[in-house]
Amino acid sequence: MKTYILTSPKNIPYFNAALEEWLLTEFKKGEEIKVIYFWQNANTIVVGRNQNTYAEVNLSEVEKDKVNLFRRFSGGGAVFHDMGNICFSIILPKAKKEMENAYEETTRNVVKFLNSVGVPAQFHGRNDLEIEGKKFSGLAEYLSKDRVLVHGTLLFDTDFTKLAKYLNVDKTKMVSKGIESVQKRVVNVKEYLPNLSTPTFLEKMVQFFTETEHAETIHLDESSIKMVEKRAQEHFQSWDWNFGKTADYNFKNKKRFEGAGIFECNVQVDQGKVVDIKFYGDFLSVIDITPVTQQLVGQKYDYQTFAKILGNIDNFKEYFGTLTPQQMLEVIFDNKKDE
């Protein structure tokens, strides 16, 4: 299988997201290839696909400081990017999705590179890379028709004061971890490589992957760049994508499940039937969850109806990661089994 590598020519989040999507869905379409993609976003908040932007982000501070904000197309939680942060994507044929420990296997060479330069990095938990118990990288996954994408951040020299300033960390997550602040849960790789600048570190990382994977560098032509820029402006930079429709709901509930993440449900009910329903959270979905919520709209708002629908979803794990239908029902109905 041939491997390709690319470092984005821009640090604009909307462009970089559109370029990532293009690599996933259009580049060498129909061919079984591996793509390694590096990019950096300047001064940017990134929320997960299934998160509520208004709840996750301190919007007053974001607007005051003119911080970029966009929603990625994968699940997981919100993060802050600056030029001390390096993002990476690894794209593989969809068949590779079936391997066990997909996150760990896919990012094995990231850990190998860091170990080779003296950083004691390791994979931990459901989707994190850590150094001595502190997180420096969070991973998320997404499936296209033919390919699987695993991508993540790598905190090299990020300003953690901004990380805490712009993100509203969920209290249930903080309580479960027994830690007081965002800063105490994360670490910069630069603490272990004090003599390296971010550009030099990225250069070494790209060189390592190019040599280890025998990767061919991708050279973007003008038509591809224009296509990516058009997609960035029309989709990833749009209000509809980044904020979406909001509404008043009859019922809202949220809970964190160990090993699965936060699940929040907002339901609007009229005359006993679901008019609208939204699921939010940092659960690790790899495909769009809209088909699930569409099945629930118009149904009776009762436990047995929802249990039957959720229980009959064959690819449930692709929609909700390690969340179970029972856990979702617990949140949706607050432990009340309506008859």
Curated annotation (Swiss-Prot):
Pathway: Protein modification; protein lipoylation via exogenous pathway; protein N(6)-(lipoyl)lysine from lipoate: step 1/2; Protein modification; protein lipoylation via exogenous pathway; protein N(6)-(lipoyl)lysine from lipoate: step 2/2. Signal peptide: none annotated. It is an enzyme of class 6 (ligase). GO terms for molecular function: ATP binding; lipoate-protein ligase activity; lipoyltransferase activity. One of its GO terms (cellular component) is cytoplasm. Pfam families: Lip_prot_lig_C, LplA-B_cat. Keywords: ATP-binding, Cytoplasm, Ligase, Nucleotide-binding. Its main location: cytoplasm. SUPFAM superfamilies: Class II aaRS and biotin synthetases (SSF55681), SufE/NifU (SSF82649). InterPro entries: aa-tRNA-synth_II/BPL/LPL, BPL_LPL_catalytic, Lipoate_protein_ligase_C, LipoylTrfase_LipoateP_Ligase. Catalyzes both the ATP-dependent activation of exogenously supplied lipoate to lipoyl-AMP and the transfer of the activated lipoyl onto the lipoyl domains of lipoate-dependent enzymes. Belongs to the LplA family. This is Probable lipoate-protein ligase A.
